[in-house]
């Protein structure tokens, strides 16, 4: 039954806001560069982002990938280098070549003592993954959660999904953009013709924001607060 007052969504927003307020001290309080140091056409955007808790960073390199095909090989190479932790947060995770290859690397890293966490949107449980898939990954030593799992007839947050695509490795490199972990995003399959989605890799200080964003959403999904240094 879809409740008109949408209590589930209201509770989720309250929980998210509580976590933001309790973790804001992990984020830089201001941008690393002044407004005047930026090109004029970017100053308003930088001010807006800073007011939303996403400051501008220096000491960061950005690498652009015009296709998921290009990003995927770099993602796998960087995953192989992980020494401390791997965080994955994606809207879509679908079994196939792309996810299978990543999962094999994750299993290797878990066996090497690397902490691995996977967070994916609950809509995947409708047709892409078994509802019990988090338990399967947990047995492999991978911490896994679904964001807002869909329960037919009782869910109150059908329209509130986690569309992020974030991969963070050791807090040193992060990937984000438009590609999910599914074969069409690397043109391994062709469901709708040639698939073009872009991605970027960040190396340096700006990865801190991606790390914090992941941990905040993880806490929203688990009702727990992360208290260690991000």
Stretch-by-stretch model annotation:
Residues 1-228:
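N-terminal localization/anchoring segments of enzymes in phospholipid and broader phosphate metabolism
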């Amino acid at each position: 039954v879809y409740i008109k007052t949408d209590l589930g969504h209201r509770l989720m927003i309250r929980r998210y806001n509580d976590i933001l307020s309790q973790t804001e001290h992990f984020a830089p309080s201001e941008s690393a560069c002044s407004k005047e140091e930026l090109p004029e056409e970017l100053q308003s955007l930088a001010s807006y982002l800073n007011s939303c808790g996403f400051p501008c960073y220096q000491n960061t390199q950005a690498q652009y990938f015009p296709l998921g095909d290009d990003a995927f090989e770099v993602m796998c190479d960087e995953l192989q280098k992980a020494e401390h932790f791997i965080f994955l947060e994606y809207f879509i995770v679908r079994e196939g070549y792309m996810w299978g290859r990543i999962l094999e690397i994750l299993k290797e890293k878990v066996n090497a003592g690397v902490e691995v966490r996977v967070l994916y949107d609950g809509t995947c449980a409708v047709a892409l993954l078994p509802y019990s898939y988090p338990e399967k990954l947990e047995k492999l030593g991978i911490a896994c959660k679904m964001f807002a799992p869909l329960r037919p007839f009782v869910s109150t947050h059908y329209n509130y999904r986690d569309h992020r695509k974030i991969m963070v490795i050791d807090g040193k490199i992060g990937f984000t953009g438009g590609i999910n972990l599914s074969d069409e995003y690397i043109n391994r399959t062709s469901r709708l013709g040639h698939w073009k989605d872009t991605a970027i890799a960040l190396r340096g200080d700006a990865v801190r924001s991606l790390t914090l964003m992941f941990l905040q959403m993880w806490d929203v999904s688990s009702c727990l607060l992360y208290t260690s240094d991000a």
